[in-house]
Structures are given as structure tokens and as C-alpha cells.
Amino acid sequence: MKTKKTDALIYTVLIIMSILFFFPFYWMLRTAVVDAGSIFSPEMKILPPRIRLENFKNALTVQPFALYFVNTSLITVLNIIGVLLSSSLCAYGFSRLHWPGRDKVFGILLTALMLPYSVMMIPHFIGWNFLGLTNTFAPLIVPAYFGGGLFNIFLMRQFFLAIPDELDEAAYIDGAGRFRIYLSVILPLSKQVMIVVGLFTFLNNWNDYLAPMIYLSSDKKFTLMLGLNQFIGAYNAQWNLMMAAVAIVVFPSLVLYLFAQKYFIEGIAMTGIKA
């Protein structure tokens, strides 16, 4: 009897928490399909009396979202390629190769994770401005090919450490070199963590607002996040069109996570950072 009461209490709390977490998503969808005058109406109903699907069409035509989508997709795809390539190589060097001071160097590098992006923001901008590469995609893409981020290296290193060393030794006896072992042994066994890092990279770049705002000044180079900000004027905001655009922008992230959910959970568990 006590167990049933405990289970009922747990499920009740979970249902309440689910409703609280789902409410912002519901509010986004509801705002996206009503007219501007009904958003903050005191007689708000759960389902709007009239659903205006034309808001989605208007949201995509009032701003050049096709161009913003291409820009964001280009930045995101190139970042995913760069992060997976460079972070896996760095993680391989810190996990499978044995050299003096390896773990100490890695520990020193991890201290950089304590530095917030705001600390490095101005020095980075000064450097890119000195190179004449502001208002280009270079500051948003090139860093991915030089390490791929310490957190991603950490995730992959933890995963690589769980792979038995005997596999490396067997491949080495068969005549494989270090790079061949990386390509033929380590990467094929690391599908889960590669998907996790790829998903993190996708979300970070797809939803990034700060970095594009700092480096991009031309409308033709705007990303989706900067495009969403165009719905907010000096004296008013088109909230219904903005929420319609937000719903469209969020959709790829939801679909990608649903398809990669299994590998995402497995990768997190096997890297050793689960709760």
C-alpha cells in the first residue's frame, strides 16, 4: 500500500512538472496561430477560436528566412564537420597515445572550461577584426577546425578511454599505424559519442545568437536567430509572426533529437558524465 502511494505521488509530481515544461511550447504554438490582438486578451482560451495558419506563411515572407536558413545551415554543417574531425583527433591523442605529461597537460587545458565566453569575447573580436574577417562566416566556422572545443574533447576522451587497449594492440600487430587505428578501430566504435557531440554542436550553432550578432553586420549574412530579432521593432513587436517563425526554427532540432535520442542517451551514459 505504501509503495502504491509513493508511486502515485511520484507520477503526480512528474505530470505536474511535464505540464510546466510543456507550457512554454504550448504558448509558442498558440501565439503562432492567433492574430496580434488576441495574444494578451483577458478572455484567453486554451484553444483559440480561429487558427490562423497564414501566420507561418507571413512569417517566412516578411523577412528573407530562406536566406537566413541557408546561412545557418552552412555554418552549422561546417561546424559539425570541423568539431567531429578535430575534437576526435585531439581526444585520440589524449586517450590512446602515451607521451610524457599527457594527463597533466589535459588537466591544464580543462581549466579553460572555467572561463566564460564573455571573458574571451573581446580578444577574439579584436583578433578577427585585425585579420579583416569580421562580417564574414570565418569567425563562426574556423575555430571548429582547431580543437573543436574542450568540452567535446573531454566527452570523446572519456569514451575512447573505455575502449579496450587490446584492440589497438591487435591492430598494431597486424601492421596498422596510429592513424589507421584511429580510422579503422576507434571511430567505428565511437558512433554514440560522435552523435552526442554532433547533436550538441548542431544545437549550439543552430541556436547561437551572440556570436553572429558580434561578427555579422550585413543583412545578407544574418542567421535565423538574428532574423527572429527583426520582428521586434523600436515601439512594438509582431509576436504572433515571431512565434510562428520560432516554431519553424525549433522544428529541425526536435526532429533531430527524436531520431538521435537512443544514441544520445547511450553516448552520455558511456562517457561517464551521467548523473
Task: Give each language-model segment a name.
Residues 2-275:
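A structural signal for multi-pass alpha-helical bundles of membrane permease subunits
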